[in-house]
Amino acid sequence: MAMSEQPQPVAGAAASTTKARTSFGILGAISLSHLLNDMIQSLILAIYPLLQSEFSLTFMQIGMITLTFQLASSLLQPVVGYWTDKYPMPWSLPIGMCFTLSGLVLLALAGSFGAVLLAAALVGTGSSVFHPESSRVARMASGGRHGLAQSIFQVGGNFGSSLGPLLAAVIIAPYGKGNVAWFVLAALLAIVVLAQISRWYSAQHRMNKGKPKATIINPLPRNKVVLAVSILLILIFSKYFYMASISSYYTFYLMQKFGLSIQNAQLHLFAFLFAVAAGTVIGGPVGDKIGRKYVIWGSILGVAPFTLILPYASLHWTGVLTVIIGFILASAFSAILVYAQELLPGRIGMVSGLFFGFAFGMGGLGAAVLGLIADHTSIELVYKICAFLPLLGMLTIFLPDNRHKD
């Protein structure tokens, strides 16, 4: 697929893209790549019951798989983002996807728990390259509509995450772990698409090379920026610890509490992840209109009533509540990321890497900690504890209102 969008000024500062045209072709391509990347990642989560059965894993070991993947991704993402802020590397996108492809092949062939951990680490490494650089591409193609661009980019990833469990239920669960190899085709398609995006990215870089850089002015004093970033990271902790409870253990919760089969439990997980994808579409554009702070406030604190009710709900209402929770909670990340990018203009890669990396790290840590709790108590207690996490959304009151017209 040829990328024919006209080159735009690189978004080193917000002002540099305000009059540029939004490149929807590039945004669509990077969103498709995000869909394929996160679909592949979600396969690991979706086949946890198969891995538990094949290797006789405890909940703690299942949490270790998530932790390995998330740490491989989270520790490298800020480094990749910081480095590529200084030295742009357009071709890192397809190269990173090659790590993901190798992890998929190893997962399909894995004969031990150690091999599964290594496969998770390889997929995580691919993710560490993909997310900061693709987020930068989304901002470059935004034409100044940063919230909209991030939502288009994010929704691809969330739809991919929701597709993973559904495809796993159809393609992998009935036949065994070896069928993971079929998803190598998705990785190859992603490499082709990312290669085309890299050509566009390279053209952007060549066009802007040698041009004087825009003066970057921080919108807030340093101490307020530090406070705001700290609060945003606490909110990321709240969101992704709770998300880890659903993505890693929701199928087990449904199977143990309500006696569902693996396939039916995975369909419930698909419904949750689909709601997450739908909610992602809302956060960015609404943040462009009314301000990121208010979207963040509503999306984190707004789910608290539903998370508090969830542990005591019937099967029907459990399905309904998790869909509502996923939809509302998902609108937060695009708003948080663009808010942080506006706090630290000129550091798009580092900010993207930091927040994607921290989000992944909290997801991995949450999976390990919650798995330990589930092993020593019960899976139901996990949801009773996590129900209170969205109350941390009250900290949003201390965020400065940085609304501005692009």
Swiss-Prot record:
Source organism (scientific name): Escherichia coli (strain K12)
Cytoplasmic side: 124-151, 199-225, 288-294, 341-353, 400-406
Keywords: Antibiotic resistance, Cell inner membrane, Cell membrane, Membrane, Transmembrane, Transmembrane helix
Identification of the protein by name: Fosmidomycin resistance protein
Topology in the lipid bilayer: Multi-pass membrane protein
UniProt-listed InterPro entries: MFS, MFS_dom, MFS_trans_sf
GO function term, MF aspect, one: transmembrane transporter activity
Entry's Gene Ontology BP terms: DNA damage response; response to antibiotic
TM segment ranges: 43-63, 64-84, 103-123, 152-172, 178-198, 226-246, 267-287, 295-315, 320-340, 354-374, 379-399
Principal cellular location given in the protein's record: membrane
Summary of the function given for this chain in its UniProt record: Confers the resistance against fosmidomycin.
Listed GO CC annotations: plasma membrane
Topological domain ranges for the Periplasmic compartment: 1-42, 85-102, 173-177, 247-266, 316-319, 375-378
Origin: domain of life: Bacteria
Similarity section: Belongs to the major facilitator superfamily.
Compartments it resides in: Cell inner membrane
